[in-house]
Curated annotation (Swiss-Prot):
Family statement drawn from the similarity comment of this UniProt entry: Belongs to the SUI1 family.
Species of provenance: Methanothrix thermoacetophila (strain DSM 6194 / JCM 14653 / NBRC 101360 / PT)
GO terms under biological process: formation of translation preinitiation complex; regulation of translation; translation reinitiation
Molecular function in Gene Ontology: mRNA binding; translation initiation factor activity
Name of this protein: Protein translation factor SUI1 homolog
A Pfam family that the UniProt record links to this protein: SUI1
Keywords linked to the UniProt accession: Protein biosynthesis, Translation regulation
Amino acid sequence: MSSEMCTVCGLPKELCICEEVAKEQQRIVVKIHKRRYGKEVTVIQGIDPHEIDLQDLCTYLKSKLACGGTVKDGVIELQGNHIGRIKDLLSKKGFSASQISL
């Protein structure tokens, strides 16, 4: 085992549960915004960028939903209307389904 210890929980890095606890405490809001020419964008907000790597989460969602997307100002934007599948995908990544509002 490595001698590195987590500064938050005091456990070794391999056993650290800080990120899982942070995921369960997030209050996530998913909305659909209309853009130019009637294009729809799924916007995911409420995830703390200091505790969760938004770029990795965005890459995961883009690959599962087969769409384009980006991270802007702590908000994940995905091209298209994906509100039907987003709750299930976020739950699989460890976020609490009861904390996700559509």
